[in-house]
A protein has these predicted regions:
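Conserved acidic residues
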Residues: 28, 69, 91
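Short catalytic micro-motifs in class I SAM-dependent methyltransferases
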Residues: 96-101
Length: 306
């Protein structure tokens, strides 16, 4: 797995790192799994958290160790985190852009539950495989890996909303917060030849559920920690439905506004073309030759009125 590093605005409402920081909360004992150079943990420390980390890359781990209480250099495939850190050692375990790199994310997620103190939570971020850019690219027969992003070449698992929630539930957890980051299907790193797409397809994709969701950021707790699982699941589905409806309405309004803007621009272009053609005709010798008799006729007609 490559080493990732990032600067981010902790106040942003549309950034997975800032959303994770908010879902973790202040003054927590945190394990940052796949901590890289410690950029996320640094923001958590600034909020009063005590942070430990796990990282496979020794150089990145060395940088994080200058900030964290402890950094374990290990491969998540075979490390026993509970044996190393102790059961119930953390208020929050963070899995930021980790699960998609794991051949068996189910096993990892079930394992980290043992690290949670009573009332603890797991905070997860992962890309959305149903983002509109990927839908459009697949319509054109494209699935091209990149160094970063939705099709990071090191991703081995892919999640939509239902798949991610099923993974969480399978680990004995229930999602209490699901927050999307959003990006327009034509505004990300995925290669889409949009002029070649049929009319209306892009707007249709924009309006689909999660068509503009770039990443999911989730907070999950033990299923028995905050009451009945079914009640929480039902309420979560209701909230998700309300959110999707609001986002769909917003996307439809945006699409209508964009279509109106395009129609206006096209009309302005047509008017400009017509004006240029008119000037071109008026500048020809034939037009000037015909214009002189018309002016004389106009003068004569005006004289007769007098």
């Amino acid at each position: 797995m490559p080493t990732y590093d990032a600067d981010f605005d902790a106040e942003s409402d549309n950034n997975s790192h800032s959303l994770m920081v908010r879902l973790v909360g202040p003054d927590k004992r945190v394990l940052d799994v796949g901590c890289a150079t410690g950029y996320l943990g640094e923001a958590l420390i600034a909020r009063g958290c005590r942070v430990s980390g796990v990282e496979i890359d020794a150089e990145a781990a060395g940088r994080a160790a200058k900030l964290f209480d402890e950094v374990l250099v290990a491969d998540l495939v075979d490390v026993d985190l509970v044996a190393h850190f102790g059961a119930g050692s953390f208020d929050v375990v963070v899995l930021g852009d980790v699960l998609e790199h794991m051949v068996d994310p189910d096993r990892l997620l079930r394992h980290v539950v043992g690290l949670l103190a009573p009332g603890g939570s797991v905070v997860i971020s992962t890309p959305n495989v149903t983002h509109g850019s990927l839908r459009l690219a697949l319509l054109q027969g494209r699935w091209r890996y990149t160094d970063l992003g939705l099709l990071d070449r090191t991703h081995v698992r892919f999640f939509d909303r239902r798949g991610l929630l099923a993974l969480i539930e399978g680990a004995g957890l229930v999602a209490t917060d699901v927050r999307p980051t959003t990006a327009d299907p034509l505004g990300v790193e995925v290669d889409v030849d949009w002029p070649a797409l049929p009319p209306g397809v892009i707007d249709w994709v924009r309006e689909q559920p999660d068509g503009q969701t770039y990443q999911f950021v989730v907070r999950a707790v033990r299923a028995d920690a905050d009451g009945d699982l079914q009640t929480m699941r039902t309420r979560l589905e209701e909230l998700e439905g309300e959110l999707r409806e609001a986002r769909e309405q917003s996307a439809q309004a945006q699409a209508r506004a964009e279509r109106a803007a395009r129609d206006l621009e096209a009309a302005q272009h047509r008017a400009g073309d017509a004006e240029q053609q008119l000037h071109a005709v008026q500048s020809t010798v034939t037009w000037r030759t015909l214009a002189a008799p018309r002016r004389v006729y106009g003068l004569m007609k005006g004289g007769r009125r007098r």
